[in-house]
Amino acid sequence: MSLELLSQLETKIQATLENIELLKMELDEEKQKNEALLSQQQELTQKNQQLQQDLNSWSDKVNGLVGLLNNEI
């Protein structure tokens, strides 16, 4: 092989390695975003469960009051 071909090959390999490094950095960023979203999802799921429990509690209280009113009438 001529030196020119070797130089072209080296340039292509270097560009490929740089591209791989960029892709690794992008992958790391996406992994971090994914972890943050999973954490946020867990928090929202817990909050949703708490709100569901609160709603059920208030529904029971309202139904109890309606029952008392019906008994009085």
Swiss-Prot record:
One of its GO terms (cellular component) is cytoplasm. Pfam families: ZapB. Signal peptide: none annotated. It comes from the Bacteria. One of its GO terms (biological process) is FtsZ-dependent cytokinesis. It is found in: Cytoplasm. Residues 3-66 form a coiled coil. Keywords: Cell cycle, Cell division, Coiled coil, Cytoplasm, Septation. Its main location: cytoplasm. InterPro entries: Cell_div_ZapB (IPR009252). Homodimer. The ends of the coiled-coil dimer bind to each other, forming polymers. Interacts with FtsZ. Non-essential, abundant cell division factor that is required for proper Z-ring formation. It is recruited early to the divisome by direct interaction with FtsZ, stimulating Z-ring assembly and thereby promoting cell division earlier in the cell cycle. Its recruitment to the Z-ring requires functional FtsA or ZipA. Belongs to the ZapB family. This is Cell division protein ZapB.
